[in-house]
Every structure is written in C-alpha cells, then in structure tokens.
Amino acid sequence: MPSESSVSIYKLDQLEYQYHYLTKSLQKFEPRYPKTAKLYNCIGKKNKKKIEKLLNSLELKTLDKELDESYSKLLNNKIHYYETHLSKCIKEQIQKISKKNSSKVKDAQKNKSPSIDIEKMLATQLSLDDLALFMTRFRLIKILHQRIKQKSKKIEGDTNNKTWLNNNDYSGYINDKTSKWNPSNIWNEVITKLPSCEKLNALIGQSKIVQNLTESFDLSICLIFGFDVSAMKAKKYGAREKTANANQTHSNIDYDTDDGNEKNAIDSKSNAIGAQTQSNKETTSDNEDLLIKEYEGMLGSSGDEGEGGGYLNPNINYNEVTDEEPSEASSDEDDSDERFSDSEENEPRRKKPKLHNLPELMAGYYSGNDTEEESDEDNKNVKGKKKKRDTAEDRTAREQMSNEPKRKNRRGQRARRKIWEKKYGSQAKHVQRELEKEMEDRKQRQIEYEARVAKREAKAASLEASRSREREDRRTETNNKKEKESASTGEEHPSWIAKRLAEEKLQKAKFEGKKIKFD
C-alpha cells in the first residue's frame, strides 16, 4: 500500500494536470508520475467518458482553492517532520561534541590553543534546545528559499502558482527580514556572536546524519514542486563517482612515479658498475705487460721444461726482483677494489628480478678430453660476450614492458548493476530476474496458501462428519435405553389397561342417535 505522502502528491499531480487543462497550458506541465498522463489519455470508451465528464465539471476557483490547500498541507507536513528530526539530531551531535571536548578543554587551557566550550557558550544567552532549533531552521529555510526561487523562475507569468508556493510556515520568515528566524539574522545575531559557534556549526554540517536529512528534505521539496528528482540523484551519484575515480588516479600516478624513480636509480647504478669494471680491466692489462717484460728470460715453452733447458739472464738481480714491494699501479688497483667493495656494501641490497625459470638438466655429467676443455673455455668467452648483450637487450625489454599501460581492474557487481539501471532502467537483466523471482515467490506463496485452505476445509468437513456420527449414536443409545426401561417394567398398570380398553370400545361403537324435528 502506498503511504499517505505519496497519495497526496499523486493527488496534487492530478489537480495540477486539471488546472493546466483548463488554462490550456498542458505543454508546459511535466507530471511527476507517468500514471497521471495515462489516466487522462486512456483508450477505453467507458474510461474516456468518465474523464470527459470529470474535466467538463471542473471550475478554476475550486481548483485554485484545492491546490492552495494541498501545497500548504504538504509543505507544512514536511517542514514539521524534518524540523523535529533534524533538531533532535543536531542536539545529539552537540552533546557528543561537548563530551569529546570536555577532556580537550583542559589540554587546550594548558597549551593555550582554541577549543569549543559549549557550557560557556550557552551559559548566558541560549539553551541547548534553542540553539539546535536555530541551526535547523537556518538550514531548512535556506533550502526552501532556494527551491522557491527556482520554481518562481519557471512560473514567471502565472500569479496563482506563486501564491501557492508562499502558503507555508517558513514563507513569513523568508519575506520578513526583521524576524529572528530569518537566516541572515540567525547568522549575524546568533552564530557569529556566540563564541566558537561558527566552528560548531561547521562540525555539525560535516556529520553524515545531518547531511542525509538535509538532502532528503531538499529532494522531498523538489518532488512537491515538480522538479526532476531522478536527474538530481544521478548528478549527485556522478559527482561521487568522479571524486572516487580522481582519488584512484592520484594514487596510481604516485605509484608509477615511485616505480620510475626506482628504475632510474637501478640503471644509473648499473652504468657506474660497468664503468668501474672497464677501468679495472685496463689497469690489469697494463700491469701484465710490464711483468712480462721483466720476466722474459724466465719464460719458456712446455717442451723446454720437459728437457730441462731453462736459462737465467745474467743482467738481472733476481733477489732484488723478488724482494721488491708492490708497484704503485698494483696498490692503486687494490685501493680501487677496496673502494668498490665498500661502496657496494654501503648501498642497500635489492632483490634481483628472476628473468626465467629454466628447467633442470635431464642428462648426466661427462668430463671429456683436454681438447674439449679448451674448446669449452673458448665457447665460454664467446658466451660471456653474448650474455652481456643479452642483459642490455633484457634491460630495454623491461623498460618497454614497464611503459605498457596497466590493465584496469574490473568494476564490482554493484557498480555494474547501477550503470545498467541507468542505461536500461526497468528492462535491465538483473532487474528482470529479480521481478521474475518475485513473481515465482508469489505463485509459490499462493499455492501454499491454497493448500493450507484446502487442508483446513477438509479438516472441518471431517470434524462435522464425526460430530454428526456422534449425535446419531447418542440418539440410538437414548432410544435403546427407553425400550429397555419399558421392557424391564413388565405388566402395565390396571388403570392404563382399563383406559386402553375404553378407547377401543369407543372406536368400535356404532352411532345410535335420534333425529329431532323442530316445528
């Protein structure tokens, strides 16, 4: 069953349709519910006749009065409902803030930092209920004033509609700028004058309960004034989605920048290590040439060693050569090696990425000959060069892979369903499935209900049959008892016998009357 508010709004929609029909301005009118247009543009003959009768019997004066009353009732009901609920909510929020700040006030006094002391705020001028009412009316009157302005812009030529809008409890406060409930007076004389009341008002406005109540009040007034509520809801939902997407993109950008910085640091370190290794190789090759020149006389072929034909150089003092200290070049090499090792130790260790998971060898080990070992060493040198090339290529490939756009995560089921509802409305597949489920549940409930009713009827019939049998049994029992009693008495009383015989004689007696003649 629809609620009272929805029924009254539907009635208002019908009254407005009738008014625009009489004023011949149906093109401007946009009905709140699709039922109103269907009702007044029906196809059946009987319904058409009824509606024609209804429209012909209408009068502008009566319609104006009805519209005025319905607008004022609806607006006043909404105002009263939301004022009571919002004032309670704001009062609770103020009490929560006062409890939280009671412990913070002492710390603030020590640190000399500003804090909200609600007891001092309300000690002189207002009570807590009055402050809550001021804050609620400040919010609700502002919302209603904005929507009245928006509606009056739509209806610039129609004076009757403007009078309908101003018939509510808050219209007097909006028009009368001297009243204490005017939002500008509330701001200037209450919120700004009380100490730290602006901060309190902002904190209350941030609470979700207050925001939800104000939004629902705004939407209900928009529905009364005939605005497109679904479009407003879609706008709010879109704004929330945009903020969520913006936060996601911001976090993704930060993640990408961090990855890029890490990659640049790794590349720079690898280049530095490569340069150091090249310099070390050059120094070692120079030192080897010098040593070969010094020990030319001592070197010989493998064949000479076997024959024992080695010779000594008379010009060289071998004791001096062996007792020499290491040269400057070699010391420089050691220093450079030590520095390189220290620098490597000081740098933070990073996990090397595993490029491939290679399969294990299936064959056994075979040593081979000396010639094969030499060929293997040559091959290793060749492969080492190839490996260097491969690492550079792998590095470029990794960079290209990192530049590829990352795959976006799929949206959740609820988000996708909301999008489908916006696109297809009631014809979305999940909506259709839900409707089918509801219909099946209804059918199942109907079947179960019918089965229960049939059971009850069968039970009642069986009870009635058993009761009728019991009655018949009782009757037969009573009759049998009477017969038994008469049989048990034996012979009848003589008076009864005499009476019975007299009756029998009377029945058998003949008529012996005389005819009497009158002169």
From Swiss-Prot:
One of its GO terms (cellular component) is nucleolus. Residues 321-337 have a biased composition (Acidic residues). Residues 407-420 have a biased composition (Basic residues). Residues 244-254, 267-282 have a biased composition (Polar residues). Residues 241-497 are annotated as: Disordered. InterPro entries: Bud22/SRFB1, Bud22_dom. It is found in: Nucleus. The keyword Nucleus applies. The modification Phosphothreonine is found at T257, T371. Residues 426-470 form a coiled coil. Residues 338-348, 431-459, 466-497 have a biased composition (Basic and acidic residues). The modification Phosphoserine is found at S367, S375. Keywords: Coiled coil, Nucleus, Phosphoprotein. Present with 3250 molecules/cell in log phase SD medium. This is Bud site selection protein 22. It comes from Saccharomyces cerevisiae (strain ATCC 204508 / S288c). The gene is BUD22.
